[in-house]
Amino acid sequence: MQDRFVRRINELPKALADELLPMLGEQFCGHLDAQQVKQLCAVSAMDSHELGLALLPIAAALAKPPVSNFYVGAIAVGSGGDFYMGANLELQGEALFHSVHAEQSAISHAWLSGETQISDIIVNASPCGHCRQFMNELVQGQAIRIHLPGQDTAPLSHYLPYAFGPADLNVTAPLLSKQQTELVLESDDPLLIEALDHAGLSYAPYSQCHAAVVLETEDGASFCGRYAENAAFNPSMLPMQMALSALVRHNRSFSDIKRAVLLESSQGKISLVGATMDALHAVAVVELEHLVVDPV
């Protein structure tokens, strides 16, 4: 079991902790498939949402909050019943806008794993306005059920009434919809090809700045982030922050980063290079490789 879970697992009921323990090996990064969820429900005599609430201490253990020291854990439930954990991330000494909220982390975890719809968000603290707006960008966002400890379950529409969302800006394919933008790059560099693939899957209906970041660590592993825009603009999630969140979920250190690539479309109304460099240079002594490519 990873060290970060040692104290947290003691907060769980014993039967649940005993069943979960073998799942928390070195490769665990916060994902439980639907079969594992059913297995844990059976052992703990909980339904899936009760289980999610019980597992929030494990999700919170994924957090890295050096500024607030406030650990937030969240679980996004995919349409097939998979659990995707996420947690808040803050960059030491840097402006707070670089932060990743737990709900964003969990949702990006699900998106990077191929989910196209989220039915529920389970979180240990009431979603802030930023996160409510971020969730409202998702497929059927207003219907997502929010679960909080000690409170009745309610849809996002309860937490964000009279919402402004993608439809108000004539966007008909919201975040998590299956969509792809074809971008052109001639290269045999696997990291650049990976960045190209993820940029094509990014969500940028407002600026057309389809973009992705890929981080490579010393052992050759790669961690990706896609740009995820928001109708309210400010709650958009930058690809570097998404990639850093993925790296931390996988229990890696920023010092492990040896390469960092930002690939973005030449047709974007904006560029993410400045913000991406700021975040990267806050955590690693690595130069950003910046590629601008044309759409088909």
From Swiss-Prot:
The protein's role, per its UniProt record? This enzyme scavenges exogenous and endogenous cytidine and 2'-deoxycytidine for UMP synthesis.
Q: How does it assemble?
A: Homodimer.
User: Do you know which Gene3D superfamilies this protein is assigned to?
Assistant: Cytidine Deaminase, domain 2 (3.40.140.10)
Q: Which residues participate directly in catalysis?
A: 103 (proton donor)
Q: Name the residues that bind substrate.
A: 88-90
Query: Sorted alphabetically, which NCBIfam families does this protein's record hold?
Result: PRK09027.1
Q: Does the keyword Transcription apply?
A: no
GO cellular component terms attached to this protein's record: cytosol
The gene behind this protein is cdd
Which chemical reaction does it catalyze? cytidine + H2O + H(+) = uridine + NH4(+); 2'-deoxycytidine + H2O + H(+) = 2'-deoxyuridine + NH4(+)
Q: Which GO terms describe its biological process?
A: cytidine deamination
Q: Belongs to which family?
A: Belongs to the cytidine and deoxycytidylate deaminase family.
Identify the enzyme class: hydrolase
CMP/dCMP-type deaminase domain ranges (all copies): 47-167, 186-296
* Documented EC number(s): 3.5.4.5
Record-given protein name: Cytidine deaminase
Co-factor(s): Zn(2+)
**Residues bound to Zn(2+):** 101, 128, 131
Q: Cofactor note from UniProt?
A: Binds 1 zinc ion.
Keyword Transmembrane helix assigned to the entry: answer is: no
Query: What UniProt keywords apply to this chain's record, in alphabetical order?
Result: Hydrolase, Metal-binding, Zinc
One Gene Ontology term of the molecular function aspect: identical protein binding
Originating species: Shewanella amazonensis (strain ATCC BAA-1098 / SB2B)
